[in-house]
């Protein structure tokens, strides 16, 4: 996708609260949405159809279904994003404006577009899990000092088996 002109900034900032309170797939979706947001106001009017295209999945994954909230509802539930529907006063013409809260010093991660360019072929959940791990690293490093694994699970809101699945060496290694 490097050859494709995408409306992305070179990097974005994400609140650790946003990262840690969404599931893995939604973390990556939010990261991609933030890449399209204005760097000062953190606002974007990217459509869910556009976002699905950037992430490489179907639009249906963003809609409410039996037993799951829509992507927008999940974002709202974090308290980190204000979502407004804007009506253009024309028939069948409206759009959604997303405004992410400004990040708090020491409680965010700066994530480059390089992450998108390099890892966009990995499984969506794995991309989100990498971002979740990144959110618990020491500032300006990639060192995770949380131990035992139970503390990590609690911090990133993930189950024990999932953490072990992604952090333990493969039997094939």
Tell me the role of every PLM-derived stretch.
Residues 60-74, 159-165:
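Short amphipathic alpha-helical interaction segments
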Residues 78-79, 168:
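Alpha-helix C-caps/helix-loop-beta hinges
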Residues 152-153, 159:
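C-terminal terminal-subdomain/extension
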Residues 1-57, 80, 84-151:
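Short recognition helix of helix-turn-helix/winged-helix DNA-binding domains
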Residues 166-173:
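Conserved small/polar residues in nucleotide/adenosyl-binding loops
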């Amino acid at each position: 996708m490097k050859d494709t002109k995408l409306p992305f900034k070179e990097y974005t900032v994400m609140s650790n609260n946003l990262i840690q309170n969404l599931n893995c797939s939604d973390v990556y979706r939010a990261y991609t949405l933030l890449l399209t947001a204005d760097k000062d106001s953190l606002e974007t009017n990217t459509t869910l159809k556009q976002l699905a295209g950037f992430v490489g999945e179907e639009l249906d994954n963003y809609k409410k279904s039996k037993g799951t909230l829509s992507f927008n509802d999940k974002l709202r539930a974090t308290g980190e994003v204000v979502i407004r529907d804007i009506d253009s006063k024309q028939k069948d013409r409206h759009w959604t404006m997303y405004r992410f809260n400004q990040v708090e010093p020491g409680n965010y991660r700066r994530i480059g577009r390089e992450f998108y360019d390099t890892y966009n072929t990995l499984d969506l959940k794995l991309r989100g899990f990498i971002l979740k791990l990144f959110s618990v690293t020491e500032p300006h490093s990639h060192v995770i000092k949380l131990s035992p694994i139970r503390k990590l699970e609690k911090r990133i809101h993930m189950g024990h088996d999932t953490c072990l699945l992604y952090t333990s060496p493969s039997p094939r290694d």
